[in-house]
UniProtKB/Swiss-Prot annotation:
A Pfam family annotated for this UniProt entry: SurA_N
Enzyme class label: isomerase
Signal peptide: 1-24
Domain PpiC: from-to ranges: 173-274, 285-385
Subcellular location: Periplasm
Record's catalysed reaction(s): [protein]-peptidylproline (omega=180) = [protein]-peptidylproline (omega=0)
Keyword presence, Chaperone: yes
Naturally occurring in which organism (per UniProt): Baumannia cicadellinicola subsp. Homalodisca coagulata
Lineage of the organism: Bacteria, Pseudomonadati, Pseudomonadota, Gammaproteobacteria, Candidatus Palibaumannia
InterPro entries tied to this protein: OMP_Chaperone_SurA (IPR050280), PPIase_dom_sf (IPR046357), PPIase_PpiC (IPR000297), PPIase_PpiC_CS (IPR023058), PPIase_SurA (IPR023034), SurA_N (IPR015391), Trigger_fact/SurA_dom_sf (IPR027304)
Reported function: Chaperone involved in the correct folding and assembly of outer membrane proteins. Recognizes specific patterns of aromatic residues and the orientation of their side chains, which are found more frequently in integral outer membrane proteins. May act in both early periplasmic and late outer membrane-associated steps of protein maturation.
Gene Ontology molecular function, alphabetical: peptide binding; peptidyl-prolyl cis-trans isomerase activity; unfolded protein binding
UniProt name for this protein: Chaperone SurA
Keyword hit for Isomerase: yes
A Gene Ontology term for the protein's cellular component: outer membrane-bounded periplasmic space
Length: 433
């Protein structure tokens, strides 16, 4: 799931849509602005994104691009989106209603908002709930395509994981004595206010190199219009700090002055007075080695047909007529694991959903499961081995960090490769392929 979250963040960089602009003006005569293989991009699509970006820039007091520059930028993003959607179609990748509903539920729950309330708010604001769902489905679809295409391109060496895991362990087991200063900003600061606050932050950082007491600095440089806030954090664990501050303390040393750190409420400065490291023991966790065959449902294969097909495959494997590995390579629709005969490798048991965890624990080594359904389709699973290992939380965190870094890098490369392979014609624009 972390991989999907990261990919969604990459997608947002490419396909940001301000939802209140998601309904095109009526009565427009659409024109084709670009051809991408056998698909087209319409002027209305361009206008929706152009309006959304311009409105976002106005709301956030950002400089706006010239129309020609902005149009070129948007068309490029729409071309990339179209190419990835075409890849999804070729690979028969879809987003199930159950998965979409779950993600909307998770997103709304995190904001203490029910789906019914979200729907009501959106219907009262230009009736855009359906458009919101469609946009989210497209973002998830793109994430699935990127995840499938890029997974096998990423190589993470064991020594990379070990090195980063040690750094994470040290930081997680560290408590800090910190001074914290906040230069507050209004909810929608002007560019002038931002520049003045940043200049003050840099000045205070220089002053704090000479003077330890942030409180005195805050009193000295506060004005009637801008009161600086300062307080101490003594013996606070790294894991208990707000994420926006904690991530800036990796690599910090005693005496470090860290900043400017930007947040929604202003600019933060930290000074590290002391760092205390403690030792924490590891608790063993369960890992499983499994392989699977995945059959997706489609207009040509319903749920019952997929389940029956897997039951027949399981029967033939059990009597020795066919090999699990060979049949996985031939028919499994998990394009990543199918190349390895369905092999999923070693994974922490808690990385699986509760249904799959229960299923895996019920199997003996070498035993096949009954066909089981997920949001991806129907699975036939074979447990190959199970073991207890030392807690690899830090290694898992290190692996995820490395994965995310490399994923972001190669996503851009892969997208450019797909663009180079596609037939692209921009109408009334220079073709920048």
């Amino acid at each position: 799931m972390d991989g999907i979250k990261l990919l969604l963040s990459i997608i947002i960089l490419y396909f940001y849509t301000y939802i209140n602009c998601a309904i095109a003006e009526p009565n427009l005569i659409d024109q084709v602005v670009a051809i991408v293989n056998n698909d087209i991009i319409l002027e209305s699509e361009l206008k929706i994104l152009r309006d959304s970006i311009q409105n976002y820039a106005k709301l956030n007091y950002q400089e706006q691009l010239e129309d020609n520059q902005l149009n070129k930028h948007i068309i490029d993003r729409l071309i990339i989106k179209k190419i990835i959607q075409q890849q999804a179609k070729l690979s028969h990748i879809t987003i199930a209603e159950t998965k979409l509903n779950k993600i909307i539920h998770d997103l709304t729950s995190s904001q203490n908002l029910s789906i019914a309330k979200l729907r009501h708010l959106m219907y009262s604001n230009r009736n855009i709930y359906d458009i919101y769902r469609a946009q989210l489905r497209q973002d998830l679809l793109i994430a699935e395509v990127l995840n499938s295409a890029l997974h096998r391109r990423i190589t993470i060496l064991p020594q990379e994981v070990e090195f980063l895991a040690k750094k994470i362990a040290i930081r997680k087991n560290t408590t800090f004595n910190l001074s914290h200063m906040l230069i507050p900003l209004p909810e929608k600061p002007s560019r002038k206010q931002k520049n003045e606050a940043e200049a003050l932050a840099l000045f205070l950082m220089a002053q704090s190199e000479k003077q330890n007491d942030f409180r005195e600095l805050a009193i000295k440089y506060s004005t009637d219009t801008q009161m600086l806030n300062s307080f101490s954090m003594i013996g606070i664990q790294h894991t208990k700090l707000p994420l926006i501050l904690a991530k800036h303390l990796y690599g910090a040393q005693k005496g470090s002055v860290i900043g400017p750190i930007y947040s929604d409420i202003g600019i933060h400065i930290l000074k590290v007075h002391d760092m205390i490291r403690t030792h924490m023991s590891n608790i063993p966790i369960t890992e499983v080695y499994a392989r699977h065959i995945l059959l997706r449902t489609s207009v040509k294969r319903n749920d019952n047909q997929a389940r029956v097909q897997l039951l027949n495959i399981a029967r033939k494997i059990n009597i020795g007529d066919i090999s699990f590995s060979i049949v996985a390579k031939q028919i499994s629709e998990d394009i990543i694991s199918s190349q390895q005969g369905g092999d999923l490798g070693w994974n922490a048991l808690n990385a699986f959903t509760p249904t799959f965890r229960k299923l895996l624990l019920s199997l003996n080594k070498g035993q096949l499961s009954i066909p089981v359904r997920s949001s991806q389709g129907w699975h036939l699973i074979q447990l190959q081995n199970i073991r207890q290992v030392e807690n690899t939380t830090n290694k898992e965190a290190a692996y995820r960090i490395l994965w995310h870094r490399k994923l972001a890098e190669i996503a851009h490369i892969w997208i450019q490769e797909q663009r180079d392979l596609a037939y692209i014609k921009i109408i009334n624009h220079h073709d920048n392929r």
